[in-house]
Amino acid sequence: MKEIISRHKAGEQIGICSVCSAHPLVIESALRFDLNSGNKVLIEATSNQVNQFGGYTGMKPADFRDFVYGIAQEVGFPRERLILGGDHLGPNCWQNEPADTAMEKSVELIKAYVAAGFSKIHLDASMSCADDPTPLDPMVVAKRAALLCQAAETTATDEQKRHLTYVIGTEVPVPGGEASAINAVHVTREQDAARTLQTHQAAFRALGLDEALNRVIAIVVQPGVEFDHTQIIHYQPQAAQALSAWIKETPMVYEAHSTDYQTRQAYRALVRDHYAILKVGPALTFALREAIFALAQMENELISPEQRSRVLEVIDEVMLNEPGYWKKYYRPTWSQAMVDIHFSLSDRIRYYWPHPRIRQSVEKLIANLNNVTLPLGLISQFMPVQFERLSEGVLTPTPHNLIIDKIQDVLRAYRFGCTPDVA
């Protein structure tokens, strides 16, 4: 990370896409995409996804590291080009507990991530706990972030400290996209970014963490990008010019969250304006979902009814029987909720792919289509971009390859934004 930031600060318009997903096909897509490019690949886990208690994936930080390393080994991707990051590390998971208890757990969370070899650490203590006022005083946020940083510094070996980097601050939207409809988004004011930096510097120095301040590479801000279930707010460079100008005077860059679904030109403009770390998550699993839905349509055309996977029906059954991951986010009317379940840009289907019934049905779908030849006309009908790539000779028409390539469509837009010489 330090090399990428140094090059950006030296005047190169380069950035890095942060892949925020625990889905094996998404991780495989990212590693295959940059297998021969020489680029570093940044893969991040969030605190609710992966923590010392297992998170919703059931993985602790060391488990997630081994999970990613296992995929890298299968792909042939060298570990030295992998950067592992932890996102929103702090009391996020324990906001309903008293602050002292939540912070004790947060310290252990940080230690577990650093001990497992994660080198990009987002110190985020911005959320109020059960006995806190709302919102938290910025100095309290900074002091808690400093305590988390201290835990990282005491855990890291000298070798790890060579690569260890920190991100401070938080964005306006909730982690994972907006829960309700959006009409506009508040762009972070430069004075608020400056205050974030100043309060963190003071809090770090109060704990003797002067050296650690040199490892702070980025501040999380809101440059004016967001999405909800049906809408996207696109980047408007003119609205963020003061914010962009301020960061030039520091040794840092910005990190932008919720950049999913922006245009490739927007990504290039964001990187130009020093939002050099671009987070993406739901857009990648949305592309995965599109690919599986497309393959299900092909299956309906090619496979006899009694042999089909019924993957779309299985998804509906599971999500309706177990609505915990979507009920409070989607519209209450039945017909509207079904549209959201299938097609919402926030893509809450992503929480259900590991479900045993859904996983088995996806495996059957892929097995069924592996046993037949996929007609080019059918691929053109349901995956037209992949049809073009087949015609160009850069893609072989297997179900697995079609899924991977569909996910990589998202990564192509980020590559355009993060790499100035890509046309």
From Swiss-Prot:
One Gene Ontology cellular component annotation held by this UniProt entry: plasma membrane
InterPro entries the UniProt entry points to: Aldolase_TIM, GatZ/KbaZ-like, GatZ_KbaZ_carbometab, TagBP_ald_GatZ
Annotated pathway: Carbohydrate metabolism; D-tagatose 6-phosphate degradation; D-glyceraldehyde 3-phosphate and glycerone phosphate from D-tagatose 6-phosphate: step 2/2
Biological-process GO terms, alphabetical: D-tagatose 6-phosphate catabolic process; galactitol metabolic process; phosphoenolpyruvate-dependent sugar phosphotransferase system
Highest rank taxon of the organism: Bacteria
Signal peptide residues on this chain, from the entry's feature table: none
Keyword Cell inner membrane recorded: no
Keyword terms, alphabetized: Galactitol metabolism
Role: Component of the tagatose-1,6-bisphosphate aldolase GatYZ that is required for full activity and stability of the Y subunit. Could have a chaperone-like function for the proper and stable folding of GatY. When expressed alone, GatZ does not show any aldolase activity. Is involved in the catabolism of galactitol.
Quaternary structure and partners: Forms a complex with GatY.
NCBIfam families: agaZ_gatZ, PRK15052.1
Family classification: Belongs to the GatZ/KbaZ family. GatZ subfamily.
Listed name of the protein: D-tagatose-1,6-bisphosphate aldolase subunit GatZ
Native source organism of the sequence: Salmonella enteritidis PT4 (strain P125109)
Organism ancestry: Bacteria, Pseudomonadati, Pseudomonadota, Gammaproteobacteria, Enterobacterales
Gene: gatZ
